[in-house]
Amino acid sequence: MSTLHKVKAYFGMAPMDDYEDEYYDDRAPSRGFPRPRFDDGYGRYDGDDYDDPRREPADCPPPAGYRGGYAEESRYGAVHPREFERPEMGRPRFGSWLRNSTRGALAMDPRRMAMMFEEGHPLSKITTLRPKDYSEARTIGERFRDGTPVIMDLVSMDNADAKRLVDFAAGLAFALRGSFDKVATKVFLLSPADVDVSPEERRRIAETGFYAYQ
């Protein structure tokens, strides 16, 4: 359509049917093959050719897990636990254990024990008292006043009464010019003034534990 004809049609000098717009006649060239509306593109692929990215390849080996303590395994073989070598530990012998545990009263030579308390030795008259409560303090005082060495075994007493009896014995030994010594836990030796007990003899008394059998 010429420009002159367009002007005539605009002012009504030419019929409108003759007006043709090149815009409407222009068609874009067809590219490729026709596609239906809302084509998602999946119709062009066959089911066998489609690879799901979430699916692992069939020929890939399974992921290796933690193999601590297990031997190497084949691809489809069973898992066998690895055998660890255990160090051999020596078993304690009953005889050696008995020899090592022989201490205290059993470790003391009975002959040495008899020599220490033989006739004429200051400790030959020693006596052991095991008071149950503080009311037996009178018996301890009487034995000590008569010149007899006294061992007080306070193991069976509660701490409160044992403390009172220790204070009483310490005051008694001080008043009569004797000595008051600790032999073992909650075990004390009261020695009169004419009985001299050396540290070695106190150690032997503790080691022999003879007061536990009197």
From Swiss-Prot:
UniProt keyword list: Cell cycle, Cell division, Cytoplasm, Septation
The UniProt record lists the keyword rRNA-binding: no
Pfam families assigned to the protein according to its UniProt record, in alphabetical order: SepF
BP GO terms, sorted: division septum assembly; FtsZ-dependent cytokinesis
UniProt region (Disordered), positions on chain: 23-70
GO CC, one annotated term: cytoplasm
Biased composition (Basic and acidic residues): 36-58
Subcellular location: Cytoplasm
Coiled coil listed as a keyword: no
Record's function text: Cell division protein that is part of the divisome complex and is recruited early to the Z-ring. Probably stimulates Z-ring formation, perhaps through the cross-linking of FtsZ protofilaments. Its function overlaps with FtsA.
Subunit structure, interactors included: Homodimer. Interacts with FtsZ.
Family: Belongs to the SepF family.
Name of the protein: Cell division protein SepF
